[in-house]
Amino acid sequence: MKMNLPPFIELYRALIATPSISATDSALDQSNHTLINLLAGWFGDLGFHVEVQPVPGTLNKFNMLARIGEGKGGLLLAGHTDTVPFDDGRWTRDPFTLTEHDNKLYGLGTADMKGFFAFILDALRDIDPTKLTKPLYVLATADEETTMAGAKYFSESTQIRPDCAIIGEPTSLQPVRAHKGHMSNAIRIQGQSGHSSDPSRGVNAIELMHEAISHLLVLRNTLQERYHNPIFHIPYPTMNLGHIHGGDAANRICGCCELHMDIRPLPGITLNDLDGLLSEALEPVSQRWPGRLTISELHPPIPGYECPPDHRLVSVVEKLLGTKTEIVNYCTEAPFIQTLCPTLVLGPGSIEQAHQPDEYIDTKFIKPTRELISQVIHHFCHH
């Protein structure tokens, strides 16, 4: 059966050659169905039980869960199938053709992160499934780069409860055990426009926004005082007021003003908590000016994530790699997978290459990544 599997570089080539862009712009957004079917075929050839799941609320997007071995617990290896769009003018190579040059493999998704599936498949050639005493799961998700709809749906709907999970995002093989979340909102104030010669005939949205901002700055201080986690370089939740637009002329009362802001919560603060704090902070403005203030999401929010430092997954991986776990500033699917089991983010390639023109992975990662995957499968599925 394993003889059917193409060589490592051909697996990689086929993954990169199968476009799977996710984008908020529907003109650029693509289904990942072809890629999911490709993966499903390969894992099926290796004797895995494969399930392909449509992701509700998406346009033709799918998750794949492959399982081999029986029983409870085990290990989940996870990754996303989608890539960001590419800027044609800034790429010097074809994004969908795997190109090797100067010990680098170039292509869209080489580092972030379709290539991870080639590493998993390659490592599985040498593993005898009859020797597994616990199940090995491989999860391929949709839309990580936009809404994280695939990971969210999977974590809410699956029955599996592995002992632990590894998400193969490009961390240069440095294990990551925590990151903050991200929530971005638009605060919109609807005033009443009119000529500036008679202020009493209008409601100035800029003045109301000034009031709203003063309440937001109080909330910013509250977040800083109330929440603290020393593992982070900035040990409290941050708030940034990033963009504001209102009015159209000096001699007109401003009829509408909109502020875009973000909050980066620590692990342990739920998205519901944050929504509540934001609404509560702006409630005095809403009460004074009924119906004039609205809060909306700019992007789907992501909670913070932390894997307990004393979990066996952390000690095993730190020992295998001879390095300590790290904390990072970017967001991943880990908060959703962490609801099922302790999760680390750990994979080949550098985050510096993600979302860049001429994206690549250094070939120096090939051997250690293959070894690491074999070792963690052996450790968590053979005992």
From Swiss-Prot:
Chain residues that bind Zn(2+) 2: 112, 145, 355
Reactions mediated catalytically: N(2)-acetyl-L-ornithine + H2O = L-ornithine + acetate
Disulfide pattern: none
Keywords: Amino-acid biosynthesis, Arginine biosynthesis, Cobalt, Cytoplasm, Hydrolase, Metal-binding, Zinc
Active site: 82, 144
InterPro entries: AcOrn-deacetyl, ArgE/DapE_CS, Bact_exopeptidase_dim_dom, Peptidase_M20, Peptidase_M20_dimer, Peptidase_M20A
Gene Ontology CC entries for this record: cytoplasm
Pfam families the record matches: M20_dimer, Peptidase_M20
Family: Belongs to the peptidase M20A family. ArgE subfamily.
Record's protein name: Acetylornithine deacetylase
